[in-house]
Regions:
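Non-catalytic ligand/cofactor/substrate-binding and regulatory segments of enzyme domains
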Residues: 1-23, 130-148
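Short glycine- and Lys/Arg-enriched binding-loop motifs that mark or flank ligand-binding interfaces
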Residues: 18, 25, 31, 36, ...
């Protein structure tokens, strides 16, 4: 977006994100309490924080990020959100993780505090867990939600 955006209230983002806790994992879904994957979680939070999704997400395979070098998630987030340096990201920020060095960022989470984050994880569903050094060093991009 070309115009400056006002930021959504981080406390509101966190409250909305926590409402998704316990949602089962379901590939490509985005329905609180029913099922979601990590991208579906971010999409659902977007709808509650900002409003309707600005564009449809095409179907994707589980291994979509295993080949290629395009940072598809970062490009999409950059078009609608406010990018910040990962080290400066605080509670309520959407973060993108590289699951392997030099791989594209393909996992999404929401920072809950400086020491925890929320994400949808296969077999576990939506959980909140500590932002351990292992998770922290995987953060490749961070974005803030705009205000509705």
């Amino acid at each position: 977006m070309t115009q400056p955006l006002a930021l959504a209230d981080p406390a509101r983002v966190i409250t909305i994100a926590r409402a998704w806790l316990g949602t089962p994992y379901h590939d490509q879904a985005s329905l609180r309490g029913v099922g979601c994957d990590c991208l579906g979680l971010a999409r659902g939070i977007w709808r509650d924080v900002v409003g309707p999704e600005p564009f449809p997400i095409p179907p994707y395979s589980r291994d979509w990020g295993e080949t290629g070098s395009r940072e598809v998630l970062a490009e999409g987030a950059r078009a609608m959100m406010i990018e910040v340096e990962p080290a400066a990201a605080g509670p309520g920020a959407l973060v993108l993780f590289r699951m392997r060095p030099r791989a594209i960022a393909k996992h999404v989470g929401i920072l809950i505090g400086r020491e925890s984050f929320l994400h949808a994880y296969e077999r576990l569903g939506v959980i909140e867990e500590p932002l351990t050094p292992s998770w922290r060093r995987r953060i490749a991009f961070a974005f803030l939600f705009p205000q509705r």
